[in-house]
Amino acid sequence: MALIIQKYGGTSVADAKRVKEVAKRVVKYKKAGHDVIVVVSAPAGRTDELIKRAYELSDSPNKREFDMLLTSGEQISIASLAIAVADLGEKAVSLNAFQVNFKTTSVHTKAKIIDIDTQIIQKKLDEGNVVVFAGFQGITENNEITTLGRGGSDTTAVALGAALNADEVEIYTDVDLSLIHISEP
């Protein structure tokens, strides 16, 4: 049994139909006997929509609040995918950075990963769950939400792969769910 981490971008989780397609792919891996962690981005266009909203409210939004706003997009994706996976008969749990102590620097909007506490993720995997994890975000030592900047979900997937000694990290393109990269972290 291998530990596989899959990362899907915003277009892959843009609507219910696409979320269900991702769920089918995830369940296929789980049924093959693998442990699966899925890292997802916010639905397509959601981050840009949230950025626009922040700048409609202020010419210079507070960076802490900006990060709080931006991370709401991933919440939609992780919960949606966990629901879709469970509907296909597999146990699934959605997790945010604060739930697993995904520690970053305190530089809002451009944080760097410091440490990942893998205990909760490993426990959820051991319980038979597909773990659906929010990409792009972290938490500081003072429990402040941060974002990793554009491309942060890819970074999240690779960092999780390294921290958990995953057998593979798979990053799927948004265009047609083609696998563009397989690596050993």
Give the ranges of each region predicted by the language model.
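Nucleotide/pyrophosphate-binding catalytic subdomain
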Residues: M1-S183
